[in-house]
Amino acid sequence: MARGLNRVFLIGALATRPDMRYTPAGLAILDLTLAGQDLLLSDNGGEPEVSWYHRVRLLGRQAEMWGDLLDQGQLVFVEGRLEYRQWEREGEKRSELQIRADFLDPLDDRGKKRAEDSRGQPRLRAALNQVFLMGNLTRDPELRYTPQGTAVARLGLAVNERRQGAEERTHFVEVQAWRDLAEWAAELRKGDGLFVIGRLVNDSWTSSSGERRFQTRVEALRLERPTRGPAQACPGRRNRSREVQTGGVDIDEGLEDFPPEEDLPF
């Protein structure tokens, strides 16, 4: 089994004023919405800007410390991890991939450029949106092609994490790869170890029941296959890493909303 690695690094502007609340047990929860624009290199040499909004959660003493000090528009650096949560609501299982902050620090905004969305909320241009994961595939990759012939692969990654004084937890992350990277990933199999470098994106859609649904996933920019573990027993498959310039998707539309508070596991 691949050694678990689960790190998230974000630099963005606070799209709104952070929201502070407490659990019945008295635990402080600070929810922040960071907004930014990633500058990507496309296949044709262009540099499109792709907008993102990520919800970050800070707990405990740090939440109380920063709750009254942060305000809309401030630039913030976040180091944290992805945390998978599952709960049941009205007999239906729900899940969420959350960004849990371990460290937060405001940044000097001199020389930084901002943009505004249609609601006047700030986004940081040339922001930072990076994820590093290592885990094992939970299923064989699913490869398909768009009507334009572009390859896209979906992968499920299980990341094991053991923190000091706590039991081991497994976080389940959906990963998407495009073009040559997708075709390379399609040769992997369930159980293979995989190291992923990518960026966080959000999907939203309407279910068959008319309910709005959301999913946070990782768009892979680089994949590496460790030589140890289950993957080592497959000498006929390519033992190479692959990287791409950009996933080529625009997530600027449809991300104005986030799951309502009653859908969150707190």
UniProtKB/Swiss-Prot annotation:
GO cellular component terms, semicolon-separated: nucleoid
Lineage: superkingdom: Bacteria
Xref: Pfam families: SSB (PF00436)
Region feature Disordered, mapped onto this chain: 226-266
One of the GO biological process terms: DNA recombination
InterPro entries: NA-bd_OB-fold (IPR012340), Primosome_PriB/ssb (IPR000424), ssDNA-bd (IPR011344)
Annotated S-S bridges: none
UniProt motif Important for interaction with partner proteins: location: 261-266
Stored PROSITE patterns: SSB (PS50935)
Gene Ontology MF: a single term: single-stranded DNA binding
Biased composition regions of type Acidic residues, renumbered to the chain: 250-266
Record bears the keyword Disulfide bond: no
Keywords for this protein: DNA damage, DNA recombination, DNA repair, DNA replication, DNA-binding, Repeat
Domain spans labelled SSB: 5-108, 128-227
Family annotation (PANTHER family): SINGLE-STRANDED DNA-BINDING PROTEIN (PTHR10302:SF27)
Function: Plays an important role in DNA replication, recombination and repair. Binds to ssDNA and to an array of partner proteins to recruit them to their sites of action during DNA metabolism.
The protein's name: Single-stranded DNA-binding protein
Organism: Thermus thermophilus
